[in-house]
């Protein structure tokens, strides 16, 4: 799945996010800071799996910062590349995602990561 070696809860979402990465539209991602750094550090490379858990791309982390959900910038929302790329759409989509994951608060902390595509597998 996108950035996660575990079986994706939503294979279609994993495939959608991967397609955005491969098109060059998605160059950032974020996750609940309570999940830790997941081994990420600037300069590290990681493999992206598709919804069937097949390795499809290698990415390199170029920036990583901790940020509150309600302080995520319009620039970061644009870099995530999802929906219409607006901050409003980003907030709505990610609020729904985190609520579905069992935890959401406007002031929750996120790890916000920017990456570059190194290789297509």
Question: Language-model segments: what does each one mean?
Answer:
Residues 1-60, 64-121:
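Mixed-charge, low-complexity intrinsically disordered regions
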